[in-house]
């Protein structure tokens, strides 16, 4: 807690996966850009993606032990209370030593002990939940939070307000029309042709690849071209057609989105948020692992009229030919979906989360 100074010290907690680290970094960057006086610290584990990404971005990473919630009664469950208490003590020490004014949690292993520690130190805390189905740390944290922000309407968290996803700057600032010619050049495709962008995430590509292998000729025959990120692991055969471009991965998603008119992809929270913020119609194939959060993320977009869904188990070349190809030919349906997507996604997620944090500090 600050004495006599007007600067604020923020502790952002989260990590483990890109889904937790990226929104955290977007908010950290927003806070840092707003004031050079304020201090932005990040709380994470040694094991998570944050251990590399946070220092790389120029933030100090404070460490907390990784203590997963027990899922079954076993030895780990028996040891959980002691290990969790230790993690809470670690965070309390960080809060006191750095005179933290507010804690912001993004889910993941670091968040649960951060919420408990903040309460015990009488420091306000804010919860941000990226998925339509919240994780356990955020379910528990939201009950006592000064403010809770969610990405998708209908996320079952106490007192939740829809604030959207804090997105990467290159997506927030993207002018798709202005970059389309450059994007066509980069990927070797014609910027004048309508383009279907297909990607499956690092793990989820195989199912999409198998379906596309049998469906791409029908898509091309319908007058479309395809940019398909097939992943490193899957040896998909590139048929060598000028209108069907297969690449292992895309490191410039801003340019891929600039070329795209429709997206076929998995339904991670960041993916759905970026596609919606850019007003792109989408067909989602939710990845059927984890606790079903992708299906719920996609359902939020479908309810709004911004997307369609094909369940993972039903994704075949025939299904793409019968469902995707007619949609690609329906200009009115696509423009309705594009208009609807602005109600699902926003480019203001970072600003909205920072406004929640400001509220918590001012209380």
Where are these regions (language model features)?
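Conserved nucleotide-sugar phosphate-binding/catalytic loop shared by glycosyltransferases and other
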Residues: 7-18, 37-90, 163, 311-313
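Short amphipathic alpha-helix
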Residues: 20-32
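Active-site-proximal region of nucleotide-activated glycan assembly enzymes
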Residues: 119-181
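Conserved donor-binding/catalytic loop of nucleotide-activated donor transferases
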Residues: 121, 258-261, 274-285, 304
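C-terminal alpha-helical cap of glycosyltransferases
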Residues: 326, 346-363
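A short, well-ordered alpha-helix in the C-terminal region of glycosyltransferases
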Residues: 333-347
